[in-house]
């Protein structure tokens, strides 16, 4: 079972990805991890990727597809994989298709932009311990202060509203069109099975919907 999990930053993909990999016993593969592993191992593709990155350039989709093919040939991928952060664009999805790498399921965790902005921009972190609070959903006892140490909480750069909205725009421009791309494929070929899962509610409720979609 090969699964692509789509959703905007802050939609809760990480939680559901953990559930899918544990429930179905499949690895989560990310292009970043594959690149680092190939470079470290000094494989032919790894050396090519290293020379591209050392020159300050982006690694081509063809090279990434080569890495994915190598990774899928490993024993732990025999029952399937969960793709993490790939494909991000239509050309990457087309490259997967051209390479004959079939996808069984495409899940979109859908959350309204304003809900995501509320979720992410309300996060506050205690840098020393990594404890995470939220101004609405999990506030500290005293505003802006860590419950344990009494030290100040900070807002990470990634959680600033302006940054969140920028990341959402990139998602809508580049990655959201994949939902339509795969829906058309499903209409034509009966595969992959595309599922739209509302990402609002308790973790258990969303997980139950994910399980139904993959069954």
Swiss-Prot record:
AMP binds at residues 31, 36, 57-59, 85-88, 92, 156, 167. GO terms for cellular component: cytoplasm. Its main location: cytoplasm. The keyword ATP-binding applies. It is an enzyme of class 2 (transferase). It catalyses: AMP + ATP = 2 ADP. Gene3D superfamilies: P-loop containing nucleotide triphosphate hydrolases (3.40.50.300). Residues 30-59 are annotated as: NMP. The keyword Kinase applies. InterPro entries: Adenyl_kin_sub, Adenylat/UMP-CMP_kin, Adenylat_kinase_CS, Adenylate_kinase_lid-dom, P-loop_NTPase. SUPFAM superfamilies: P-loop containing nucleoside triphosphate hydrolases (SSF52540). It comes from the Bacteria. It is found in: Cytoplasm. Keywords: ATP-binding, Cytoplasm, Kinase, Nucleotide biosynthesis, Nucleotide-binding, Transferase. Catalyzes the reversible transfer of the terminal phosphate group between ATP and AMP. Plays an important role in cellular energy homeostasis and in adenine nucleotide metabolism. This is Adenylate kinase. It comes from Pseudomonas syringae pv. tomato (strain ATCC BAA-871 / DC3000). The lineage of its organism: Bacteria, Pseudomonadati, Pseudomonadota, Gammaproteobacteria, Pseudomonadales. The gene is adk.
